């Protein structure tokens, strides 16, 4: 698939890193939730699907929280309490658990020489988190090298505003926007913004939560190779 594009841009949360299940597992097991890694990996995408279905913007996570805790098996009578606990615990710095398949895929893509970068709605922390979690960094370093890591807090514009991508384009000089794919996990935030910016949107949809989508989907970043 990568041969179709001259560059790739990635969202960070839900694509490269997840809310840390080693923190959320014990937290939500108190309410009867399954604490396993697999359960929490699944729960994130269930939450994102519910968030997209509701058309919720970046600041609204109620549907995500409820769907997340239901996905890990919290009973109806405990959903609101568990969702509140998730809401008060999940913050920007908790999006730090590296997705193993994504790390492997990034290494392979970078090894092919394809230009890559990150464009993420974040809180000023994402470059440090991606580096500390062993995923990537902007420029040379111990992990996968990105041409740029764009943090919405730093540049002052966030998805779904397509202007966030304007800050990445100078790092991909000579490449037309339609030749760049953007991979995200949110229909409302990522797909719409990428389309509006003239990029080719791809949704990371590991559990086929969007079977009727009118956009391209992959189950894993490994499918990009």
Model-derived features: positions:
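Asp-based, Mg2+/Mn2+-dependent phosphohydrolase catalytic module
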Residues: 1-10, 98, 103-110, 114-225
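N-terminal helical cap/lid subdomain that shapes the substrate entry/recognition surface
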Residues: 2-104, 111-112, 123-124, 128
